[in-house]
């Protein structure tokens, strides 16, 4: 007969065998984020020679920044590079990139001379009238600072 204790041991064994390194993310409200910071939403880092990713529609609308991770903010890990910035972009429509309109970008070398003003000549933030429909954030124009800590998932 199978007992609760036997089931508990099997669950513990399977959990132990399937542990994986992960990085836990915590969000914080921060009104002083730069284009180089790790964040959800906001204004991205964009190198001088980089064009903002666009969707597949005939209008080629710019994608919106979902998240940006500055790899130097991460704890030691075997998941992400040690340096550079990883960005996650999503479509500016009601599907928010769930089908085809998303992109992941990695910049290994960061030009610290680029300014927010330079980025804003290329990147158009979401129109305030579209925030509620096309933003995954609440409030819809929010920008959140990210901090990271090493963890284990089971």
Named regions from a protein language model:
Residues 1-154:
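Preference for intrinsically disordered or flexible, low-complexity segments
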């Amino acid at each position: 007969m199978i007992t609760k204790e036997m089931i508990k041991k099997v669950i513990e064994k399977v959990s132990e065998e399937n542990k994986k390194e992960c990085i836990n993310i915590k969000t914080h409200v921060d009104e002083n984020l730069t284009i180089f910071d790790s964040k959800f939403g906001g204004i991205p880092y964009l190198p001088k020679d980089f064009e903002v990713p666009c969707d597949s529609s005939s209008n080629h609308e710019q994608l919106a920044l979902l998240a940006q991770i500055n790899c130097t903010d991460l704890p030691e890990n075997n998941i992400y590079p040690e340096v550079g910035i990883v960005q996650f972009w999503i479509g500016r429509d009601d599907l928010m990139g769930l089908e085809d309109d998303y992109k992941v970008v990695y910049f290994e070398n960061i030009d610290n001379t680029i300014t927010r003003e330079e980025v804003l000549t290329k990147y158009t933030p979401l129109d305030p009238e579209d925030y509620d429909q096309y933003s995954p954030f609440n409030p819809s124009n929010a920008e959140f600072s990210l901090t990271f800590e090493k963890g284990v998932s089971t």
